Structures are given as structure tokens and as C-alpha cells.
Amino acid sequence: MAAQKDQQKDAEGEGLSATTLLPKLIPSGAGREWLERRRATIRPWGTFVDQQRFSRPRNVGELCQRLVRNVEYYQSNYVFVFLGLILYCVVTSPMLLVALAVFFGACYILYLRTLQSKLVLFGREVSPAHQYALAGGVSFPFFWLAGAGSAVFWVLGATLVLIGSHAAFHQMEPADGEELQMEPV
């Protein structure tokens, strides 16, 4: 009982990220480790969207500096903006949801089938990679009808506009030693 209270206090002290667990659908491995690293290096959203920190750059040199430093500094935040745009695109397109359901349903059926026995076609055993390629081929017409290609380019374009404008107009925090530098006249 006391150990549970200590764990609960530790979780409360760590904030929201301690209580938000990664979904069980993401298998342990490189993908999960990458996502955990992104979550660990995320910058505070309050400073990310602080309207007082937005201004127009004075010249092209400052614009380039802002782009490079903000993309480096807010990289994890930008990844989650990208994932949010993907989620928005999928949720607002019912046909794309159907296409994704068909694809993941076919993959799940193939997964269950390979647990029971090997799939044999024309006397040859079909590898799991070929089975998943077949699932992709079967669901391709659904993705084509759903306009998945345009959805991909919409997400990429919206991401570039949002991230590019944020990185260009968000003022950088002065680095150590940068405050004392004088500009040439």
C-alpha cells in the first residue's frame, strides 16, 4: 500500500508524460524507442506557441538562423505537429478511414492465419512479406478511391507551411555568450 502511494507521488511529480503511456499497439523496438526519445525531448508547448515571441526577421541572415535553430530546438514538437496533421487528415476523410481499415484488417487476418499454419499457393509456401504485399495490393484500389495520394501531399504541404512559418517567425532564445556580441556597423 505504501509502495503504491510512493509510485503515485512519483508519477504526479513527473507530470503528464508519466501518466500518458504509449499505446500497446506499438511493439517494443526501434519505433517505440524513437517515439520515447521524441517525447523526452519535447519542449514546453507554452513557449512553443507564445504569441509574444513571434516577430518578423530583420534580414535574410536572421531568417536562416531562425529556421535552422528553431527546427533543431523544436524538432520533437514539429514531429508531433506532423502526427497531429496526419490524424486530422485521416479523421476528416471517411473513405480514407475505410481504406485504412481494409488494409489493417487484411494484415490482421494474415497475421492470425500465419499463427495457425503456413499459406501455400500452387504448391509453394508464401512468405509473410509477400502476404503483406498482397494485402497492400488488395487495398490499393481503396486507397486510390479515397484519394490517399492527395492526402499525403496535403499533409506534407500543410506541415511545411506550419513548421516553416513557425520556425521563421518564432524568436530564438539567446544562446550563452550571444548576448555580448556586437553587430558590425
UniProtKB/Swiss-Prot annotation:
Family to which the UniProt record says this protein belongs: Belongs to the PRA1 family.
Instruction: Note the subunit structure.
Output: Homodimer. Interacts with VAMP2 (synaptobrevin-2), GDI1, NRDG1 and PCLO. Interacts with prenylated Rab proteins (including RAB5 and RAB6), and with the members of the Ras superfamily HRAS, RHOA, TC21, and RAP1A.
Q: Which UniProt keywords apply?
A: Cell membrane, Cytoplasm, Cytoplasmic vesicle, Golgi apparatus, Membrane, Synapse, Transmembrane, Transmembrane helix
InterPro entries registered for this protein in UniProt:
Prenylated_rab_accept_PRA1
Instruction: Give the GO cellular component terms, alphabetically.
Output: glutamatergic synapse; Golgi apparatus; membrane; plasma membrane; synaptic vesicle
The record's subcellular location field reads: Cell membrane; Cytoplasm; Golgi apparatus; Cytoplasmic vesicle, Secretory vesicle, Synaptic vesicle
Record region (Homodimerization): 175-185
Primary location group: membrane
Cytoplasmic compartment: which residues? Answer: 1-78, 113-131, 166-185
Role noted for this protein = General Rab protein regulator required for vesicle formation from the Golgi complex. May control vesicle docking and fusion by mediating the action of Rab GTPases to the SNARE complexes. In addition it inhibits the removal of Rab GTPases from the membrane by GDI1.
Question: What protein am I looking at?
Answer: Prenylated Rab acceptor protein 1
Region annotation Required for interaction with GDI1: where it falls in the sequence: 165-185
Q: Does the keyword Acetylation apply?
A: no
- TM spans (from-to): 79-94, 95-112, 132-148, 149-165
Name any one Pfam family assigned in the record.
PRA1
Segment Required for interaction with prenylated RAB3A and VAMP2: which positions?
A: 30-54, 175-185
Sample GO molecular function, one term: proline-rich region binding
Q: How does it sit in the membrane?
A: Multi-pass membrane protein
